[in-house]
């Protein structure tokens, strides 16, 4: 049976799409339509999802925010090496979570919190779920993001 065109053009977001220099769908591959059933609902990406590389030294911990407007194909799924963190938009800012999880505070200990052999460390979903995040009121999250963005912009101008 033919799948809707949207499913035939579903992109698979892998760790190689998620670099510290930025996020790009150019490296994404198309989903094999026969495997669509193997992806849980949580792996179908939504605007604002955090994508956290969760496997391997050198890639473990890299993070991006998914922007659905940059996906000309519509649908995308995260492969098993990318952990999807979906904020509740009315309560938690994706930008705030991105700034927190990308911070030195988290990144400096991420390998210690991962499991597995030396080269193939894995950041378990249970570890991500149990991570304690300081969560100020929503408006304060937005202020923190604005201040961080201003500081980063100031540094980049130098």
Stretch-by-stretch model annotation:
Residues 1-3, 16-52, 67:
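Sequence-specific dsDNA recognition surfaces
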Residues 88-90, 94-106:
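Glycine- and charge-enriched low-complexity intrinsically disordered segments
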Residues 1-15, 121:
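Extended boundary segments
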Residues 56-60:
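Short, charged beta-turn/beta-strand-edge "cap" motif at the junction between a beta-strand
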Residues 63-79:
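Short, compositionally biased
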Residues 74-83, 92, 110-111, 115-136:
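A short glycine-rich beta-alpha junction/loop motif
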Residues 108, 130-158:
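Amphipathic alpha-helical coiled-coil/heptad-repeat segments
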């Amino acid at each position: 049976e033919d799948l809707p065109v949207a499913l035939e053009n579903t992109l698979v977001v892998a760790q190689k799409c998620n670099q510290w220099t930025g996020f790009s769908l150019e490296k994404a591959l198309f989903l094999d339509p026969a495997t669509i059933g193997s992806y849980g609902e949580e792996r179908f990406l939504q605007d604002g999802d955090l994508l956290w590389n969760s496997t391997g030294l050198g890639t473990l911990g890299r993070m991006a925010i998914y922007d659905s407007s940059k996906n000309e194909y519509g649908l995308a799924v995260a492969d098993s090496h990318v952990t999807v963190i979906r904020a509740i938009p009315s309560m938690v800012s994706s930008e705030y979570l991105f700034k927190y999880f990308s911070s030195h505070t988290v990144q400096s200990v991420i390998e210690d919190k991962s499991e597995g052999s030396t080269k193939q460390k894995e950041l378990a979903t249970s570890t991500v779920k149990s991570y304690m995040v300081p969560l100020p009121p929503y408006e304060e999250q937005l202020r923190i993001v604005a201040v961080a963005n201003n500081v980063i912009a100031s540094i980049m101008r130098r």
